[in-house]
Swiss-Prot record:
Binding site for FMN: 17, 42-43, 117, 152, 177, 203, 229-230, 251-252
Lineage: Archaea, Thermoproteota, Thermoprotei, Sulfolobales, Sulfolobaceae
Biological source species: Saccharolobus solfataricus (strain ATCC 35092 / DSM 1617 / JCM 11322 / P2)
Protein name (database record): Dihydroorotate dehydrogenase B (NAD(+)), catalytic subunit
One example of a Gene Ontology biological process annotation: 'de novo' UMP biosynthetic process
Gene this protein is translated from: pyrD
Any one GO molecular function term: dihydroorotate dehydrogenase (NAD+) activity
Family: Belongs to the dihydroorotate dehydrogenase family. Type 1 subfamily.
Reaction(s) catalysed by this chain's protein: (S)-dihydroorotate + NAD(+) = orotate + NADH + H(+)
Main location: cytoplasm
Length: 290
């Protein structure tokens, strides 16, 4: 069992944002059939947002993708149509502080945790563009909700500084990390393959970067962290817990292997804990304490 902000979950395995479309029946089916400890929704904005034109996703190598969907979503009200069969972490976004606050007001009745996305690299005016306003965003959101508020940050050089600003203004935790902005050129046309141009690189290559940032931030602040980035098997989960994460988001691995991999990873974790005589709580942050 894992407790995060008075929410008790069976284990640390959650589904990361961007994997499951905000289609109520689909979310409910995944909850019921595969039993993740929680699902993070795709980032929702106040009003529907059209995705970028295709191509929006390309596979670079096994376990490595690049996407520029551009936060396309059906709007915040769609969240309220989801029948909650497992805890929802609702990812919220917007092009202004006020929009983000309004989204939180709309979705909070369905959420266990609010995750503010200020790190998407794939839409001008959204996500990463607002990271410099993180303190003001947190203050605004905390004025309208009593739910735990986490902030999703990117793999930036100033991530520790931004994490500190978010926590200083009342953030309850952090989600680390979002994708890394990348570019692939078509050698026939000499143009970017993705319609948007750049895209967020995700998958296995992200894991050591995510692990380093999680450890650095946990060492600095000792805060609750949802670790995301390149997790592919149970050993990766243990690594993230050891670095300081309390929950671990599965993303690209679900695209590559399907949702049944959740149970495969879960069994690996259970066998490891049994063999070592440990609980999840014993492992969280252990690499920082050594």
């Amino acid at each position: 069992m894992i407790t995060i902000k008075n929410i008790t979950l069976n284990d640390p395995l959650i589904i990361a944002s961007g994997i499951i479309p905000d289609v109520p029946n689909y979310v409910e089916t995944i909850c019921e059939k595969y039993k993740p400890s929680a699902i993070t929704t795709k980032t929702v904005t106040l009003n529907p947002l059209e995705p970028h034109k295709p191509p929006t996703v390309i596979k670079l190598h096994d376990g490595i993708y690049m996407n520029a969907i551009g936060l396309g979503n059906p709007g915040a009200k769609a969240i309220n149509e989801i029948g909650v069969l497992c805890p929802l972490i609702v990812s919220v976004g917007g092009s202004s502080i006020n929009e983000i606050k309004e989204v939180v007001e709309v979705v909070q009745s369905k959420a266990k945790i609010i995750e503010i996305n200020v790190s998407s690299p794939n839409r001008k005016g959204y996500g990463e563009s607002l990271s410099k306003l993180i303190g003001d965003i947190i203050e605004s959101v905390k004025s309208v909700t009593k739910l735990p508020v986490f902030v999703k940050l990117g793999p930036w050089d100033n991530v520790i500084e931004l994490a500190g600003k978010a926590l200083e203004k009342g953030a309850d935790g952090l989600t680390l990390i979002n994708t890394i902005k990348g570019l692939i050129i078509d050698v026939e046309t000499f143009k970017p393959i993705l319609y948007y141009g750049t895209g967020g690189v995700s998958g296995r290559c992200l894991y050591p970067i995510a692990l380093r940032i999680i450890k650095d931030v946990y060492e600095e602040y000792g805060v609750d962290i949802i670790g995301v980035g390149g997790v592919y098997d149970w050993t990766d989960v243990i690594g993230m817990l050891a670095a300081g994460a309390k929950l671990v988001g599965l993303g690209t691995v679900l695209i590559e292997k399907g949702f049944s991999v959740i149970e495969e990873i879960r069994k690996g974790l259970q066998s490891y804990l049994l063999e070592k005589g440990l609980k999840f709580e014993d492992i969280i942050g252990i690499s920082v304490r050594k």
